[in-house]
Amino acid sequence: LKKINEEFDFFNNSKIVTIDLFGHTPGSIGLLVNLDKNQFLIASDAVSLLRNLEFEEVPKNAWNKAELLKSYQKIKKLSQKKINLICGHDYLQWNQNFKLGIEYN
């Protein structure tokens, strides 16, 4: 088990990198996934709903408002690079953009 304090590159090839997204909880992290044709940021609870980021809404259960707003800015900066953001609890985002289960052909 490795304690992660800053960015951590799992395979030393930039394919999966953690980024700190403190605010929701003291040690919140996101996963930046770099594929050949797309990039994704799995934000987990750092951005529960896309509207939280768009309107800089801080959920009531956030540990530290100032840190969460810093994380929002970091995510917005990454989003300028056309990274696909995956929110932790946004049913509308998941329902409109992602498959919700396994599809068999």
Please state what every model-predicted region is.
Residues 22-23, 34:
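Short polar/acidic secondary-structure junctions
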Residues 1-20, 63-82:
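Metallo-beta-lactamase
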Residues 9-12, 33, 39, 50, ...:
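Divalent-metal (often Zn2+) His-rich catalytic cores of metallo-beta-lactamase-fold enzymes
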Residues 16-22, 41-44:
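Active-site-proximal beta-strand elements of phosphoester/diester hydrolases
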